[in-house]
């Protein structure tokens, strides 16, 4: 008896849609060969970030120096105003009288004592009576001396350290690029020149044949 073959029903609804995979050779090649390219792009982005940070640190340092300069200028102006006030008080208390004679002219100048501590121009303690003359001369000489400009110092020394570290990293990146540009020349320079005593195969064969003929004779 033959086996009854059951017919399989193939309905269009039961079939699964076919998946077709199409490979793009250009994209595949770009993905496989793009590792170095992406690495270079990451390096460029890091260098740009370092440059931006360096600019920000330099800007902060310039602003701090400008503020210090304005502060020093205000202190100088205040000191000049105090000196002008002192000079005005001294000239206000000065009286001069001239006496004319037939042979010469005599001028008598009278300067009254000033209380400089009361005007808050000099906050030093009052000296003894014996040393008053010497102390007054020293005070006048100190006022006449020109003031020297103070050296500029940054308030935050960490800013200068950050700037130096960032510039060092930039120089290191630039040195690496220069070294990688000419690697073959260094290898060529290490190669030894061919020796002049080296003989070729044809020269060796000729020598061997010449020796054999000489021995046969």
From Swiss-Prot:
Disulfide bonds: none
Similarity annotation: Belongs to the RRP17 family.
Keywords: Coiled coil, Cytoplasm, Nucleus, RNA-binding, rRNA-binding
Sequence intervals crossing the membrane: none
Tissue specificity of this protein: Expressed in brain, lung, spleen, kidney and heart.
Stated name of the protein: Nucleolar protein 12
Naturally occurring in which organism (per UniProt): Mus musculus
Any one Gene Ontology cellular component term annotated for this protein: nucleolus
GO molecular function term, any single one: identical protein binding
Any one Pfam family match given in the protein's UniProt record, by short name: Nop25
Cited PANTHER family: NUCLEOLAR PROTEIN 12
Entry keyword annotation includes Cytoplasm: yes
Subunit structure: Interacts with KIAA1191.
């Amino acid at each position: 008896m033959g086996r009854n073959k059951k017919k399989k029903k193939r309905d269009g609804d039961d079939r699964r849609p076919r998946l077709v995979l199409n490979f793009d050779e250009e994209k595949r090649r770009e993905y496989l060969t793009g590792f170095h390219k992406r690495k270079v792009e990451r390096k460029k982005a890091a260098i740009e970030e370092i440059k931006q940070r360096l600019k920000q640190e330099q800007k902060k340092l310039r602003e701090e120096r400008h503020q210090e300069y304005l502060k020093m200028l205000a202190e100088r102006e205040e000191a000049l105003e105090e000196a002008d006030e002192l000079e005005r008080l001294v000239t206000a208390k000065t009286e001069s009288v001239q006496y004319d004679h037939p042979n010469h002219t005599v001028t008598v100048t009278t300067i009254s004592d000033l209380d400089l501590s009361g005007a808050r121009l000099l906050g030093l303690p009052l000296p003894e009576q014996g040393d008053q003359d010497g102390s007054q001369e020293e005070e006048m000489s100190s006022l006449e001396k020109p003031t020297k400009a103070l050296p500029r110092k940054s308030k935050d020394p960490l800013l200068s350290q950050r700037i130096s570290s960032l510039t060092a990293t930039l120089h290191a990146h630039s040195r690496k690029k220069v070294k990688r540009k000419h690697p073959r020349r260094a290898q060529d320079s290490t190669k030894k020149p061919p020796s002049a005593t080296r003989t070729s195969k044809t020269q060796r064969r000729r020598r061997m044949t010449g020796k054999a003929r000489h021995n046969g004779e």
